[in-house]
């Protein structure tokens, strides 16, 4: 039967009721978008598949406002742009696919899902919808107030059409973790647990380690940490053997490890180790920031979308 619902099922409606305020204060012209992240709630009868389907979850949504008649073109553009974004994470194009909706919701004239190959099959991680003017028209109807956009060039007022992109952050997190976790058999017979996180998403970008806890090596390592910590999240680790420290950082997805040894004190170089291949190279301390920043920054990932 009917029941009262107090918690929002999506973040979108807050954007719709405020879009004109944002447009005016931001002096924006159509087309423009408003993005938001926040909690949403669904009355799921069966919450299942770990964090894939929950009653309380995090959404990242964007509503992109366009002129009526142009919505399908913008829908196609956002469809391709969003797929590029997912593929830029580096999990392989073969693990993503579109699922176009045959049956559309009452408010939509086009809709598709981006699906990711989870361990339990291809599942939706993002939805892209052309919502027409349904939401804004309904808010106008029930509030009795006009929220039409005035075009200063054509001197016309109209209700914009909306393209929506909606990501379930928890599902996105699940897809990243499922694809990143590995248990690798090494040549020496050992097993390595490694989290192959995209460097831009890794919470810690770099671990700095003195080879031993004496002879000025910890002090030199701390000096490197102090210089780099303003540029990206850097961790200092001096406990256990260097091999165990490498394994620890592999398991939490840290892309790079820097080892300070006795040669460092002589020539100001360090050993730089890459998580994915375990390969090591000797680099100057002065080069560390530029080498690592190029690989781990979110801007490097976003450049792939151009």
Predicted regions and their residues:
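NTP/phosphate- and nucleic-acid-binding module
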Residues: 1-306
């Amino acid at each position: 039967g009917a029941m009262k619902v107090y918690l929002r099922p999506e973040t979108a409606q807050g954007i719709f009721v405020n879009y004109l305020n944002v447009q005016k204060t931001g002096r924006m012209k159509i087309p423009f978008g408003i993005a938001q992240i926040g909690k949403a709630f669904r009355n799921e009868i069966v919450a299942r598949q770990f964090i894939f389907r929950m009653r309380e979850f995090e959404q990242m949504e964007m509503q992109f406002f366009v002129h009526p008649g142009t919505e399908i073109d913008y829908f196609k553009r956002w469809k391709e742009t969003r797929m590029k974004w997912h593929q830029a994470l580096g999990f392989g194009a073969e693990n993503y696919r579109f699922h176009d909706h045959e049956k559309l919701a009452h408010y939509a004239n086009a809709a598709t899902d981006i699906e990711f190959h989870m361990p339990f099959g291809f599942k939706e991680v993002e939805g892209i919808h052309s919502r027409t003017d349904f939401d804004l028209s309904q808010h106008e109807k029930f509030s009795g107030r006009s929220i039409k956009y005035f075009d200063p060039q054509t001197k016309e007022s109209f209700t914009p059409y909306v393209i929506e992109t909606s990501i379930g952050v928890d599902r996105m997190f699940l897809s990243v973790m499922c694809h990143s976790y590995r248990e690798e058999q090494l040549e020496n017979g050992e097993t390595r647990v490694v989290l192959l996180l995209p460097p831009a998403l890794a919470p810690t970008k770099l671990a700095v380690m003195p080879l031993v806890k004496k002879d000025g090596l910890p002090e030199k390592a701390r000096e490197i940490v102090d210089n780099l910590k303003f540029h990206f999240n850097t961790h200092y680790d001096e406990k256990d053997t260097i091999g165990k420290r490498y394994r620890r950082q592999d398991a939490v997805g840290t892309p790079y490890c820097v080892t300070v040894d006795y040669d460092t004190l002589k020539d100001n170089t360090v050993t730089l180790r890459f998580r994915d291949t375990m390969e090591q190279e000797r680099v100057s301390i002065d080069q560390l920031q530029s080498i690592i920043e190029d690989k781990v920054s979110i801007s490097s990932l976003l450049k792939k979308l151009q």
